[in-house]
């Protein structure tokens, strides 16, 4: 006990020395939690966070006011917390609501309620994160539209095979330390919460090119993020070291947690747009087997999942705040109730890992995690999963393979909810018992996944077989190590085509079925609306096209001035790179708005035939502008007057005035030195700018504006800042320099 007290004292001294505790004020987490945070949401304009709490009981000394803190994700629940409250509210028994001014740093922080006792704040609630980061997203699309669940982990950067095989889902492995890397030739410095992080610009550009190519080939892209156990530099700050190959993300430390936040924030920005969209992020590999694949320092399952759930939450909030439909996945293997090391901390059963993870995640704000599951056959060598003896029919099954995959999907539906999706992210079948059996096993497994609504994709793990697999007796590839196509290669190619069931019926003889329609969810009509294997592939994706409106050039914004008439700009669709015009038979055009009022108007271009996807183009109808009448200067002020047509006054919200004392006027003055005044009154036709500096020359210009709602967020539509209607004058008479004593001469 004395030793424990000594350790605690040493830790507290270290924390205070590090400046984590403010002098004279501390916040202490309470043992009991009479207050429960029940909701934590940010508004769509990113200006306010609303936190709702339920007061179940009043602890002695709580008083009548509660205080809300935002703390970093790595701060433990039972730790002393630094900082000042971000909000306060009076409370009674029942519900209390906090309104907080949103800051970007809060995206990956958690909120805690406390009461004040002297100079201390005593925490009386658990922690909650923002649970709707998608409200902040700038990209709300879903990316490539797929028609099947067929996917592949391709050979590194091999687009040819993906295209030839008509693959609709691609899973890639990316090394974190190769991206976050200061030892590179072309550095990109990224600032996050006051600190600098160095990324390999060339590597990121190359990855963006790869993603763009896969998207253009008709595939959704998913990425497995892997951190090497020997990672160095800033990436090494997140690594535990040890284990066999990979490390879990060390979010239990302040520097590791902040680095992970910065990394995911950067990746979300780079891969959260339509052209370079990563549709899903898989955190680590088979996290229920930490020693082999996701080492976390030999922690207990509870401590390990504290760390992992924190990393998951950060990735979730960072990615969805940029791309609203992006997903985050936990990676799990097939050892459902099988603990490989018998109670040690090197391996955990899949079910216990999932349960513990979701419990930790849900406790700090309910979100919907997704699962990247590896459904290999029992023992990995024997392909016939329907003979797997350890794969039972109930939730107490030892393992879960393709034989009993419905046990997993039903469990997840009940445990997490029907919105959770399961990606079968890695499985392959051995060909040692014949290529026909390998092909039949793949077809059988794929049809099971196609018939199960909770499974979103089925990813085959090997294209070309690596020598490392062969050395272990695994002949899993669609192609052997020499590149020869096995029978499963062609089965993979046709598996989701209109002819699928006919092309694979000869493989039934190698299974325990007499018809593929014996599989739940598979009917003769299952693939009838799919594309024929005879038709062209890949379909041209919307990301490979651009749209011209009327007389616009390339993708320049098109703007009309309000005149009460409808404006429907003509649409022309062209191919990227070549500029070739797409025939009108390959798309339909629909104007989604009235095309008359002041605001942002949208056109939907729906592709068809050999083209896939939908393009939304926007154009603007802006208000008529005001005309400056006069600029009257004094020594420290300027009175601006203007006029505007009566009809325009009725249409607008008000005016914006810009002024600057920059030498070059508005042409060359930095934006930070141009001042803006917003007047929310369309009837006001005069304004006095105060606080000017005597002797300086000021430039003034004006525009009308109207505030409209776009995607639920207010947007100001301005008439435009013209360069013709600018007035300028001095705050007093300028100081005129003495003339030169010598006359100027012409040479």
Write out the residue ranges for each language-model feature.
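Beta-strand-rich modules
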Residues: 109-118, 689-710
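Aromatic-rich peripheral "rim/lid" segments of glycoside hydrolase catalytic domains that contact
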Residues: 273, 292, 433-539
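Serine/threonine-rich, repeat-prone extracellular segments and beta-strand-based repeat modules
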Residues: 579-612
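Pro/Thr/Ser/Gly-rich low-complexity, intrinsically disordered linker/stalk tracts
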Residues: 32-46, 623-650, 694, 712-738
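Substrate-binding cleft and catalytic face of glycoside hydrolase catalytic domains
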Residues: 165-340, 378-379, 465-470
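Solvent-exposed loop/turn segments flanking beta-strands in beta-repeat/beta-sandwich domains
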Residues: 58-74, 78, 645-670
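Recognizes extended acidic, P/S/T-rich segments that occur
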Residues: 79-102, 656-693, 707-709
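Noncatalytic carbohydrate-binding groove/subsite architecture in carbohydrate-active enzymes
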Residues: 304-436
